[in-house]
Curated annotation (Swiss-Prot):
Name of the protein: Omega/kappa-hexatoxin-Ar1g
MF terms in GO: ion channel regulator activity; toxin activity
Superkingdom field: Eukaryota
Prodomain residues: 23-35
Covalent S-S links between cysteines: C40-C55, C47-C60, C54-C74
């Protein structure tokens, strides 16, 4: 195999591997996006007003705990 043929083979191989890697990272990005969009805080769990929403039509409500500290919980 001469130098030109070897160079072409390496170029094709790099292109194929690059395409496979790009395709996998694109799929990974889509999957992570779906996971992030579907995440919500379960009912009766602590929440934050500026983070993920509560599940099952619950709302993040302010309450006082036993030490009179303000806490937030998802309540239905």
């Amino acid at each position: 195999m001469n130098t030109a043929t070897g160079f072409i083979v390496l170029l094709v191989l790099a292109t194929v591997l690059g395409g496979i890697e790009a395709g996998e990272s694109h799929m990974r990005k889509d999957a992570m996006g779906r996971v992030r969009r579907q995440y919500c805080v379960p009912v009766d769990q602590p929440c934050s007003l500026n983070t993920q929403p509560c599940c099952d039509d619950a709302t993040c409500t302010q309450e006082l705990n036993e030490n009179d500290n303000t806490v937030y919980y998802c309540r239905a």
